[in-house]
Amino acid sequence: MFPRPSDIPRRSRLSLRIAVLGGVAVALFAVLFFRLWNLQVLDGGKYLAEAQNNRTREYRVLAPRGDILARDGEVLVENRTSLALLLATDKLPSDPAEERKELTELGRLAHMSLKKVRRTIREQEEVAAGAPITLRRDVGYDLVYYLEENQRRFPGVTVQRVFVRRYPDGSRAAHVVGSVGEISGDQLKEAQYKGLSPGDEVGQSGVEHVYDKYLRGTPGVTRIQVNALGQPTPGGQLLSEAPTPGDNLVLTINPEVQAAGEAALAERGLPGAFVTMNIKNGEILGMGSFPTYDPAVFTHPMTQKQYDALVNDPIAAPIIDRATESAYPTGSTYKVITALAALENGVITPSSTIFDNGFIELAGEKFRNAGGVSYGPLTLVPALQVSSDVFFYELGLRMWDKNYLQQWSHELGIARPTGLDLGSESPGLVPSKKWRDELFANGETERPWSAGDNVQLATGQGDLQTNPLQLAIAYSTLGTGGTVPTPHVAKEVEDAAGRVIKEFEFHPRRHVKIDPGSRQAILEGLHEAAQVDPGTAAGVFGGFPVPIAGKTGTAERPGHADQSWFAALAPYPDPRIVTIVTIEEGGFGAESAAPSALAILEAYFNKQATEVSSSGGTE
């Protein structure tokens, strides 16, 4: 039977559809086959590596920081090991009630309230979101064993060995060595911290901060194979990278000088500071501030009360380094600058005579000597010896419109950055006509510059503001004959084997032209002030076997008792070191600061002073 004509197109269409469907099926199978072949053959290695990585855990191994040593090798800062309790917050239960329960239990184990646990998490996540949270350091082994036995209950909790700074002598040179702490979010953005991770520790102050790149080591990596539950498998330790310890930093600090200075300040029990420096090369042999603090306080969490006592106490303020960050009038120790300005500008010569009748009168106001004494006719050397205020008032009056005091203060380093390698310094202030007249024009003071301002400045009073380090630079420049040293505390870097791998070089900042005759006259006056009766410090240094040049100072501070100062260059006449001591509310310079300076010089020269009877002088 032959098909009807109408059936032929219908069968053709059906065959076409079957052919199309068959082609599509073949194409789909071809795509599927190619994809399987691609996964298993071409990308097989890639997915095998990913599968292996899913069975491997990497843990950063923190590197110990280098030690900080005194110049003789005495350890000022080292490390100790500690066990830290870490929490991965992404492993906490998603259910709020279960999360609260786990955090409460963790807090109980770590002796922390739930509130404190949450605050710790919040504060650390603000710095580095996603990083493990350090709940507590110095946890005991009993807690470690308990967590190992109950790992399923605390899947996000681990214990890691960390290195914590240790200070063998407590607060010794605290402001110099500084502190360390976890890197902040802002610091992570800085180029100098490239490659670091949240939770890493870096120097935050002192040499720990300035020389962090030497002290900070390189973290290592430990790789461990884990099972499907994320638990370590037996024998699962894989190839690891050991951490590289940091290098040791050797300071210029002389331990005996440092200890003597700190003990002298502590004995007085009043806020103060000292600086002892090699004037030839700028090496800081000792520098301290009182009250001080133990840097170990930064190695563990602080209470708000502890933090406030350290930072916000308006009187003690232990965190402030009074040697570099203070701002005081210096009293009669400034007379050295006045003398040099007058000599170098031809206002007087060493043999010029000024009559001291006990006071000068200016605009109806009398400026008197301390104690109301009068010394009669004086040249420069005896004027320095007895610290005649009238002599220097007269010099200030003669120079009041010349800007000589301001120029020489600046040349010698007052109210000028010293270049100290510790960073923070108070700027200081040398009052001038321009400064006060601008304040007056802006309505910030009641009067413009006057002769009385310069008269006050000539004796280190009035609006003068400086710190012990700046005064040390000024005296050093006089002692060297004009070379301005760069003060520094870093000497060299050693590797772990004690080999010197870097020596620091600090070149002089500038040279000031000082006439040798001017220098000689001033040093002679300072020598007689310190060791020849009736010098103002002869009762303190008269029995010291090393000849020195020194000057007492008594500064008036509104709202405070007099501040005590002493500045010394030793040995005289060719000094190697300078020592500056100041004690707030310490009274006359010979009462507090001078005896403290004597203790420092006795330690440096390893010689003791004998008691002397001296009428001495007043300021």
Please name every model-derived segment.
Residues F2-P5, V77, N227-S240, K280-T333, ...:
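Beta-lactam-recognizing serine transpeptidase/beta-lactamase-like catalytic domain environment
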